[in-house]
Amino acid sequence: MDGQQLRSSESPASGGGGVTGGGAPHLFHALGPALLISIGYIDLGKWVAAVEAGSRFGLDLVLLALLFNFMAILCQYLAACIGTVTGRSLAEICHQEYSRPTCIFLGVQAGLSLLTSELTMIFGIALGFNLLFEYDDLITGICFATVVPNLLPYAISHLGKKMVGTLNACIAGFALLCYVLGLLVSQPQIPLTTNVIFPKLSGESAYSLMALLGANVMAHNFYIHSSVVQGQKRSAFAVGALFHDHLFSVLFIFTGIFLVNHVLMNSAAADSTNTLLLTFQDVVELMNQIFVNPMAPTIFLVVLLFSSHIISLTSAIGSQVISQHLFGINLPLSGHHLILKAFAIVPALYCAKVAGAEGIYQLLIICQIIQAMLLPSSVVPLFRVASSRLIMGAHRVSLHLEILTFLAFLLMLFSNIIFMAEMLFGDSGWLNTLKGNTGSPVVFPSTVLITVACVSVAFSLYMAVTPLKSGSHEAELQQEWSVPSQKELLNTTQDREETCAGNVTYEEDQRSDVVPSPRIQPVDCLKSALDYIDSSDTAIESDHDSQHSTAHTSTAPESCHSPSFIPEESKSVVAVDWPEPLEPISNAIVAEESTVESVDSKSTGERDIEVEPALLMDNDKEAPNILESDNKPLGGNNPSCASDDGPPSLTFSRGKGSDAGNGSGSLSRLSGLGRAARRQLAAILDEFWGHLFDYHGKLTQEASSKRFDILLGLDVRTPSSTVRADSQANEIPKSPMVRDNLQGSAFLGSSRDLMSTKNEMSNLDLTYGLQMGNNIGSSAWSQGMQLPSTQLQSSSNSLLDQGARLNSNFSTPSYADNNQFYQPATIHGYQLASYLKQMNANRNPYSSMPLDPQRLPKSSASAVPTYVDSVMHARNQNLLASLGATPSQIAATSRIGTMMAERSYYVPSTLDGNENAGSSAYSKKYHSSPDISALIAASRSALLNESKLGGGTIGSQSYLSRLASERSQYTNSVARPAAPLAFDELSPPKLPGDIFSMQQSPNPSARSLWAKQPFEQLFGVSSAELTKSEFNPAGRSGGMTKDDFSYKESEAKLLQSLRFCISKLLKLEGSGWLFKQNGGSDEDLIDQVAAVEKLLQQGTSDNQLLLGDTQQPPCDKADIQYMRVLPNCGDDCIWRASLVVSFGVWCIRRVLDLSLVESRPELWGKYTYVLNRLQGILDPAFSKPRSALSACACLHRDIRVLNSLRHSSLVATNSIPRQIRGSFTTASVVLEMIKDVETAVSGRKGRSGTAAGDVAFPKGKENLASVLKRYKRRLSSKGQQ
């Protein structure tokens, strides 16, 4: 199509009849293009963005959505004004005003925006096809969506141009009407919120914020709108009226679109709380709960089918305009159709094949985000052209509207900058989902998204500082034309008319120069859609000559000067003889139009007609540009569970029972929790609490026998073992949650008991046992010596060569047959520095493990009186001397004896040991040195395998080989006093290598006095096996009763069960949502515990791989193995019975959160079971006072050790416990949640006439309401106390 045909093209949606200049026909001409453009804002991606924002953040983003809607109205209005005034599209003006590289970049952005719109349209039709015909094959749906929208244009191609334009307008209007009225009328139950809610922004909401921005404003629509209306040229008297018509049309249509978005957000917010929907099926099912009329989803799908035709048409128009003017490529419309479909169907098929329904949902949101990324740089040319006096003349935007455009640009730019900063430096849940850390399929690489965001922001800043080519000459033009001469002021009216006539001819040539290269003639009905011309244009343009004289005679003399873009080019253009095809252009049309521009551009005070567009926004509130992050880390080394799954190496593989990818049948997958995951969650919680409470919240018989009532504070009876207390002893607290805070002095008997003869060996055991802590860094050894696993790995060769040197501590007899398994009982404290220096000096030069001789062990502050210490010291020295120990051994023994233990703990593997082997029923394990059990286990397997491969030679094995052998003995022997080692071919059944092995134990059934501990074997330190109670107050006998053991055993098993339950919860797909809620100190504590457990689980397997352990246990066995030893960092450790109470509060809140959005009666029943059992935790959680929780070293140290695997040194961890953020969950908070659940569940209903609607839903509601009523009754009574 040549320049004449380009000027005469009109909107394909213009369906008005003859236009004589009245207001109504002008309105129809403006309404057609607006309807055509608005269909692009009602596709599936926009709908999903609104529902997702409302389901996750409620009404927090409604005000910002309103601002985005105003921005869309402003942009579309300016685009219509540009096309109407200049008669050119925005792409054509950009081609003239910007350099070629800039135009190409703008064209790439517009093309990407077109592609994302086409992609969302294909997905919308495909999913609509599947839902309408109940067909599950997405590939077939995509093929259907690719072919069907192209059939209608060819079906109506035989119709006339005017009929095609009218039909397009009717289709667009019908689709928009069904979309708006269908969704507004179909759901009267949800009240619309009229209160203005100030936006509550955070890093988590940046994702939904960008999706809403891209859903409300699209960059390619600017070019399409200006191109569609560019043929609607009117006289100066009609331009102002057209402006009002365009404003009214855009405002009317986009107001309806915003109402629909607001209804969707409000409905999703009322029916869901903090929900992340992952599939379109989830969205449809959620909407089924909201809408009363079951026809609403069907109407929406029909709208998608009708709108696909309009979107396909506008995409082809936009592609043609963009490619012709910004790229300089001329293709027919059919070619643009094929190109768009080809580029859109490839990612659609790939996403459907690889990612499924969940991936399609994520891609729909990402498409909206990409649209938002392209906006800041795309609106700069629009705003610059609209405010340019040289281009728009008298119709440039007003100052107030120019300020609004500037604020709109800042809002878009700040939104992109915040999103980019969150992607680069944030740790939000949606970012982990984009990176694939949550187990969700990665449909779009996050690195590509970050790159697009950074490039878009940089290009936006470049465009902001780059003026138009005509703007760069504005000063020169103003200097040339703004100062009128005195001669012009004295000219007569005839002279002024002659001047105007000259300018008419000049402007005619100049306007001809503006017309770009001819356009390609469209084919068939696509041609008719673009070339439809209203018959009324001839009548309007026939009066132009008479309007010229009126315009010229009523203006000042100087107002006849014509503006030019480049004066040098204008002079040359005047002398050019135009070719013949351009002559038919009406000179009267161009001359009149150019004269009006020259008149109004130089005399703003004397205009023919002054029409100021009304302001589009009644408020100029600037959106905040600072997002307040709610998920701040609690410390530099304490990652929060809000980081979902962390790096990819920390992502857990789901268990056998989980069903990843269950997207098509799941309702609202709460941040990845699908239907199967929610079912598994309920089963896990029911299993754990089923060991404690029955379905009435009463303690089970098994739990009562294990004293769980005392542990949890359900029964305040004093244990029978505490009845025999001396009058001088302190009163024993009745609740074990208070007993957890007792110091080591409570474990020591009185001096009378310590000096008794029959307890000398027991006291000696006690002296040596009290030195051992239970967690890393809890004792002096952990503060003085901490070796990371990388050090052990890098210096394993040096340790193998130097290990034998550590065997010279004691001059005790050894056996030549098995001396490779001999291990010294201990390393003297005063010899430690020399040993470290010697190892450091003789180590392998390739070793990177520095042994710091300055880190000497420091004695812990003793909590017992000095008199007791002196008595113990004297008695132990006498006993050691009587057993034949050397003075150096006695000195080392006394030094170790002064080290106090913070707390002790029973190892479950020994608690459930075989009592027939002759051991006591209960035995303790004391842990002091750093937890390197995983390293010992790894080195054991590797070295033993090496030993076997080497022919089983015993005498040549090194120190770590003996450690591995004894580690095997420790892990495979269960409380046997003289049990043979696991590797009989390597070691005889009995090893008398210790200095006390020659002395008979006073208790024949006791285990070996110098049994090696896994944490001590690396340093050669042995610990005593105590047979005394941990809780032994002053004044009591040194003996131990079974009640004391029962208490500690019960606490151990309870905490082990809790730890195993958390580990299973972490393996649920999408478990990140469970551990990133901000609900107070209980939830924060459980979140941090879960984070540490996750790192420890992965750290165990990583250490085995790091040290070359080829025989790795299965996942479940590995978890059980590493959980045999619970962490314990002292009296402030969180691993105590009160942690179970916090976990109970956490479970109540999670189950209520799930019940708030659950719509399946089967899961209602499972939640009811869990809530029934959790009634038992209400008393200790809400009736009794609880002390403030502190983040102990267990929540920090383990993370630091795991994170230091690749460093050469590790700083000792002695952090001060800090308070857990937030306060305890109160009964009133739970009552509010229960009210919300009751309201949400009462509105759920199934389809009438079905078993689900008539039986399952009512019964499920009844059961859930029953347990919630019991909760309300019990919590209400507790709140009044």
Swiss-Prot record:
InterPro entries: EIN2 (IPR017187), NRAMP_fam (IPR001046). Residues 548-557 have a biased composition (Polar residues). The keyword Mitochondrion does not apply. Disruption phenotype: Mutant etiolated seedlings display insensitivite ethylene-response in roots and coleoptiles. Mature mutant plants have reduced shoot length, increased number of panicles and reduced grain yield. Keywords: Ethylene signaling pathway, Membrane, Transmembrane, Transmembrane helix. It is found in: Membrane. Residues 43-61, 134-137, 185-208, 260-297, 347-362, 422-447 are extracellular. Residues 540-565, 593-665 are annotated as: Disordered. It comes from the Eukaryota. Expressed in roots, leaf sheaths, leaf blades, flowers, developing seeds, germinating seeds and young seedlings. Expressed in adventitious roots, vascular tissues of the seminal roots, lateral roots, the connecting region between vascular tissues and lateral roots, mature leaf, mature stem, tips of adventitious roots derived from the node, shoot apex, young panicle, anthers, pistil, stigma, ovary, seed coat and fruit coat pericarp. Belongs to the NRAMP (TC 2.A.55) family. Plants silencing EIN2 display a stunted phenotype with severe inhibition of shoot elongation and produce high levels of ethylene. 'Mao huzi' means cat whiskers in Chinese. This is Protein ETHYLENE-INSENSITIVE 2. The gene is EIN2.
